[in-house]
């Protein structure tokens, strides 16, 4: 290493240099059941129609008015309440970054805090670290429910600027008790904090917090709703969105980079919303398939526990997660070994809910690998 390269590396923050880049497991030639992707491709006639739409775009121009059209289409799709506004992101990951950026307090001598139940989505603590917020992790119960007393105590102690509640949660696929969630929201609001309801997996859940936001707008005036089109069926189209009271959302809009959503992503999302019934039918099929998958897992000898699911994933506990993961990988099935992510996830694997054929192959590989 040259002196100049070493000196240049010294300019990189020590905490960043100590990190590991997010690794995507190689998936060539394997059944990919590790990332909660929709297993169904677009029907051929829709593929052709989308290709024509994308081919006609003016790629030499920056994104423009079609982003306004997309916001309007998304607002209609979710039934966005009056007085709400929306921010678009290059995936919900970017939305999480924008929220942290907007709430950080650099140069003030006062560090803002972000709080979330754990185990949860890895981007919450990562965004807090990178944007200079303190991250407060509150463990779930052993059954992956909200520990309400612990949450209320942590909120009172740390007064978080942002509290994330994944609804349903990843990687546990749990949808927490409405009353407990509302009391956590109330507590965060009493401390002047923002609550973000992360509904990435809403197409597979039995309820949405948006209903409570409509029914009790004053009580939920500090609540923002975050969703993504990834689980809608467009993981390859990076598009997330944040909706909530305009006074809050418009402040987040100020830190959004210009042109962060490409014309290709925008047009693909608009096309998908025009054919929302196709994706709704796919989600309904996956919910039905999930019921059969959970039953098959609970009947499988050697499985220690299978948790109920409100998402397109199922969490299972096995005698040896590392051995089962490697055995399945050797059998060309890739799942997510989450056993080292958090002590509560000991010996756990996270399985994607796929098509009937995919699930059958995954079950065979799991049974042979226990």
From Swiss-Prot:
Its cofactor is pyridoxal 5'-phosphate. It catalyses: L-histidinol phosphate + 2-oxoglutarate = 3-(imidazol-4-yl)-2-oxopropyl phosphate + L-glutamate. The keyword Amino-acid biosynthesis applies. SUPFAM superfamilies: PLP-dependent transferases. It is an enzyme of class 2 (transferase). GO terms for biological process: L-histidine biosynthetic process. It holds the Pfam family Aminotran_1_2. Its EC number is 2.6.1.9. Keywords: Amino-acid biosynthesis, Aminotransferase, Histidine biosynthesis, Pyridoxal phosphate, Transferase. The modification N6-(pyridoxal phosphate)lysine is found at residue 231. GO terms for molecular function: histidinol-phosphate transaminase activity; pyridoxal phosphate binding. Pathway: Amino-acid biosynthesis; L-histidine biosynthesis; L-histidine from 5-phospho-alpha-D-ribose 1-diphosphate: step 7/9. The keyword Cell wall biogenesis/degradation does not apply. Homodimer. Belongs to the class-II pyridoxal-phosphate-dependent aminotransferase family. Histidinol-phosphate aminotransferase subfamily. This is Histidinol-phosphate aminotransferase. It comes from Paracidovorax citrulli (strain AAC00-1). The lineage of its organism: Bacteria, Pseudomonadati, Pseudomonadota, Betaproteobacteria, Burkholderiales. The gene is hisC.
């Amino acid at each position: 290493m040259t002196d100049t390269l070493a000196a240049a590396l010294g300019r990189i923050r020590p905490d960043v240099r100590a990190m590991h880049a997010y690794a995507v497991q190689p998936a060539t030639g394997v059944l990919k059941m590790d990332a909660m992707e929709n297993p169904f491709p677009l029907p051929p006639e829709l593929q052709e129609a989308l290709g024509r739409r994308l081919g006609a775009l003016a790629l030499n121009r920056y994104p423009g008015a079609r982003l306004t059209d997309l916001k309007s289409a998304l607002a209609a799709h979710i039934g966005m309440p009056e007085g709400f506004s929306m921010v678009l992101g290059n995936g919900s990951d970017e939305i999480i970054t924008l929220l942290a950026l907007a709430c950080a307090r650099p140069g003030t001598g006062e560090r803002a805090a972000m709080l979330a139940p754990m185990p949860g989505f890895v981007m919450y603590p990562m965004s807090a670290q990178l944007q200079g917020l303190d991250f407060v992790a509150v463990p779930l119960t052993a059954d992956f429910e909200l520990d309400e007393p612990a949450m209320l105590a942590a909120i009172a102690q740390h007064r978080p600027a942002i509290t994330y509640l994944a609804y349903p949660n990843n990687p546990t696929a749990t949808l927490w008790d409405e009353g407990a969630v509302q009391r956590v929201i109330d507590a965060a609001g009493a401390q002047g904090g923002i609550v973000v309801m992360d509904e990435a997996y809403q197409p597979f859940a039995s309820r949405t917090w948006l209903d409570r936001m409509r029914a009790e707008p004053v009580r939920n005036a500090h609540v923002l709703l975050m969703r993504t089109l990834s689980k809608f069926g467009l993981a390859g189209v990076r598009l997330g969105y944040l909706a909530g009271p305009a006074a809050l959302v418009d402040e987040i809009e100020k830190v959004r980079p210009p042109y962060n959503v490409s014309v290709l992503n925008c047009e693909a999302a608009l096309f998908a919303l025009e054919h929302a019934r196709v994706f709704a039918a796919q989600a309904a099929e996956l919910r039905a398939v999930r019921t059969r998958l959970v039953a098959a897992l609970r009947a499988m000898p050697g499985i220690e526990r299978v948790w109920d699911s409100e998402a397109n994933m199922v969490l299972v506990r096995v005698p040896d997660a590392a051995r089962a993961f490697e055995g399945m990988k050797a059998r060309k099935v890739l799942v997510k070994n989450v056993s080292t992510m958090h002590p509560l996830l000991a010996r756990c694997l996270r399985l994607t809910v796929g098509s009937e054929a995919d699930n059958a192959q995954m079950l065979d590989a799991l049974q042979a690998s226990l």
